[in-house]
């Protein structure tokens, strides 16, 4: 099933900011999400921010996709997540993913940390 993932892309110096235009990051979009972001990782070396401001829900498929994307980033730059809603933030805490991923409140703080 060919789900197309719309992702807004912005570049600031060596940082690529990706904002997936999807409400639910779950099994139905995980493959499309992964391939779209993997393509961005391949095209733009450097640090990556995934902006969750449009995402309301994430499940284990979405989390697994983020882990595999982080592995792809290995050696290419840092991957930071920002603008997680309280429910998603809680999911990261419960699964201890908050220890694996760098998470910032908003895009500006994520950019500031990456530019340190």
For each feature predicted by the language model, list its residue ranges:
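Acidic phosphotransfer microenvironment of two-component signaling modules
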Residues: 86, 108-109
């Amino acid at each position: 099933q060919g789900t197309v993932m719309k992702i807004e892309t912005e570049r600031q110096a060596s940082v690529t900011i990706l904002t997936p235009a999807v409400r639910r990051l779950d099994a139905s979009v995980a493959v499309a999400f992964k391939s779209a972001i993997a393509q961005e990782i391949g095209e733009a070396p450097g640090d990556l921010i995934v902006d969750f401001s449009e995402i309301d829900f994430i499940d284990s498929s979405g989390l697994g996709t983020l882990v595999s994307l982080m592995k792809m980033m290995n050696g290419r730059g840092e991957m930071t997540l920002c603008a997680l809603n309280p429910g998603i933030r809680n999911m990261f805490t419960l699964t201890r993913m908050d220890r694996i991923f760098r998470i910032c409140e908003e895009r500006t703080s994520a950019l500031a940390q990456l530019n340190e």
